[in-house]
UniProtKB/Swiss-Prot annotation:
The gene is POMGNT2. Belongs to the glycosyltransferase 61 family. GO terms for cellular component: endoplasmic reticulum; endoplasmic reticulum membrane. This is Protein O-linked-mannose beta-1,4-N-acetylglucosaminyltransferase 2. Coiled coil: none annotated. The keyword Signal does not apply. Glycans are attached at residues 99, 276. It catalyses: 3-O-(alpha-D-mannosyl)-L-threonyl-[protein] + UDP-N-acetyl-alpha-D-glucosamine = 3-O-(N-acetyl-beta-D-glucosaminyl-(1->4)-alpha-D-mannosyl)-L-threonyl-[protein] + UDP + H(+). GO terms for molecular function: acetylglucosaminyltransferase activity; protein O-acetylglucosaminyltransferase activity. Disulfide bonds: none annotated.
Length: 580
């Protein structure tokens, strides 16, 4: 009897534990489903999206998946899906073929060479590819019951969510503009991150982009074994990226940068509004120089001395900020009102995109690290329309560096290398150009601590910042280009058998009358028909008579374009055909 009671008690306790765990799992799944179904209630006054399950299932089983993509290659492709599905068990996407399926582009096996598209903005990286497996819609009868996601989904990969430079450059900026590439997407979309990382150190920043909570790949398993998206966009626009990290060739600016400071500043303004950060009046009530303080590695060993020297040189308050000790909104508040930002090379410098126009960015490099080889922040600061002053300073004195050869390899340690290689690295005066990401000499040098040589730093800054640093009270204007010249005409006259004159005239581009332009000139190309060469002319007036080398009874092709301020070249007008 006693034994029976013990067994009963044990059975009851085990059953209770199992039931408790089951209830907790159900509650977790239910909370995620509720988040998917009614996530817009808190942040969006519009009614929650609902799925008519029988109708959705019928559309999927009969019609199948629908895909239309833009872009010619996998590196610039974005795809729009209806009824794309995801197996949380296989961790693969599924394209179900039904009687209404569309797959554009229809690539066949080329879809695997190497992929349909890049899920992240890091171009052609073999860990970032997107593809799907194909099944007939009839296979749904033998598969787990689909769970339909009612939200419009934007599906992408974050590249490195623990590094602030990667977060901004690879993820936030591209997400921001991809969401605005399609009508309504910024208000409706839920972000699905499929790379497999946890939330990371900066997940709160991703939450600012959409009124709905982003979901990670690991969370999808709790929703169901087979998820189907009624409407999904897959991939990210790369148009806002300006830097490549050196996976194929040594790192540097992208060959064809398509973003300007205007787009960067529009994004920064959006983020500042979301963070409730104001640029109207500095938080300290006066102009100041902001110095980024690092607390773990790449330290400025004489930071206090540096602060004092900057204050004395520029007659301005100097303050420090760090990512470790300040909330990110406070970092942005300080940066967005600073006259000068000083920092060792590092991810925190991406916050320069919040600096006011006219401010200075001073990037410090450790010994043996050539500033010309590592330029993500220089490239950002010097984008047209950013209107920042950029200064790079490098420690050239080996006695002013403190190395850490005993640290783990990923923190710059070299103790794991053979002695000859250690000796070579210690004697090297410059890190050679290299590929990402585990070059031991690069890691050894970039994780050094530095005693800044104050006189050389001040001298370097003064080469660029001549007077008082900080925003200038001047009107910063976007560079606007001329349109085509209008009403081009030509008139010819022949004088004898060997001489001729060709008079050409035109009207100004119509947008010129609405612009304030310092200098307007016209470039005219004159080409004899049938010849491969042309003669260029730069003219200040809207008419000109050409006499040199003009032949009688000859046809000439004339191209004309307007140029503003010597550098803003407008388009050529339609070719003018003139006969003498």
């Amino acid at each position: 009897m006693h034994l029976s009671a013990v067994l009963n008690a044990l059975l009851v306790s085990v059953l209770a534990a199992v039931l408790w765990k089951h209830v907790r799992l159900r509650e977790h799944a239910a909370s995620l489903e509720e988040e998917l179904a009614v996530g817009r209630r808190a942040a969006d006054p519009a009614p929650a999206l609902r799925i008519d399950y029988p109708k959705a299932l019928q559309i999927l089983t009969e019609g199948g998946t629908h895909m239309v993509c833009t872009g010619r290659t996998h590196t610039d492709r974005l795809c729009r899906f209806k009824w794309l599905c995801y197996s949380s068990e296989a961790e693969e996407f599924i394209f179900f073929h039904g009687n209404a399926s569309v797959m554009l582009p229809s690539l066949g096996s080329r879809r695997f060479q190497p992929a349909l598209l890049d899920l992240s903005t890091v171009e052609d990286h073999n860990t970032q590819y997107f593809n799907f497996v194909e099944l007939p819609a009839a296979a749904l009868r033998f598969m787990p019951k689909p769970v339909f996601v009612p939200d419009v989904a934007l599906i992408a990969n974050r590249f490195n969510p623990d590094n602030l430079m990667h977060v901004f450059h690879d993820d936030l900026l591209p997400l921001f503009y991809t969401l605005r590439q399609f009508p309504g997407l910024a208000r409706e979309a839920r972000l699905f991150f499929m790379e497999g990382w946890g939330e990371g150190a900066h997940f709160d920043l991703y939450k600012l982009l959409s009124p709905k909570q982003p979901l990670l790949r690991a969370q999808l398993k709790a929703l169901g074994r087979l998820l189907c998206f009624s409407h999904a966009f897959v991939g990210l626009s790369k148009v806002t990226t300006w830097y490549q990290y050196g996976f194929v060739q040594p790192q540097g600016p992208k060959a064809n940068i398509l973003v300007s400071g205007n787009e960067i500043r529009q994004f920064a303004h959006f983020l500042m509004e979301k963070l409730n950060v104001s640029q109207a009046g500095g938080p300290l009530g006066e102009e100041y120089i902001l110095v980024f303080s690092r607390t773990q590695n790449r330290l400025i060993l004489n930071e206090a001395e540096l602060l004092l020297a900057l204050a004395q040189e520029f007659q301005m308050k100097t303050v420090t900020v760090s990512l470790e000790d300040h909330a990110f909104a406070d970092v942005v508040r300080l940066v967005s009102n600073a006259s000068m930002l000083v920092s060792m090379h590092g991810a925190q410098l991406v916050t320069a995109l919040f600096l006011p126009r006219g401010a200075a960015v001073v990037e410090l490099f450790p010994y043996a690290v050539n500033p010309d080889h590592y330029t993500p922040y220089k490239t950002l600061a010097t984008l047209p329309g950013m209107d920042l002053q950029y200064i790079a300073w490098q420690n050239t004195m080996p006695e002013n560096t403190v190395t850490h050869p005993e640290r783990p390899w990923d923190q710059g340690g070299i103790a794991h290398l053979d002695r000859a290689e250690q000796a070579r690295i210690l004697q090297s005066r410059e890190v050679p150009r290299h590929l990402c990401c585990r070059n031991p000499e690069w890691l050894f040098r970039i994780y050094q601590d530095t005693k800044v040589d104050i006189p050389s730093l001040i001298q370097t800054i003064r080469r660029v910042v001549k007077g008082h640093p900080g925003p200038r009270k001047q009107k910063w204007t976007v560079s606007l280009y001329p349109g085509k010249v209008r009403e081009a005409r030509c008139q010819a006259s022949v004088q004898g058998a060997s001489e001729a004159r060709l008079s050409v005239s035109w009207q100004i581009p119509w947008n010129l009358k609405y612009l304030k332009v310092r200098e307007v000139k016209y470039e005219v190309w004159l080409q004899e028909q049938g010849e491969n060469t042309y003669v260029p002319y730069m003219l200040a007036l809207q008419n000109h008579t050409f006499t040199e080398n003009i032949k009688p009874f000859t046809t000439y092709l004339v191209w004309i374009r307007c140029i503003f301020n010597k550098t803003l070249l407008g388009p050529f007008a339609d070719v003018l055909v003139c006969s003498t």
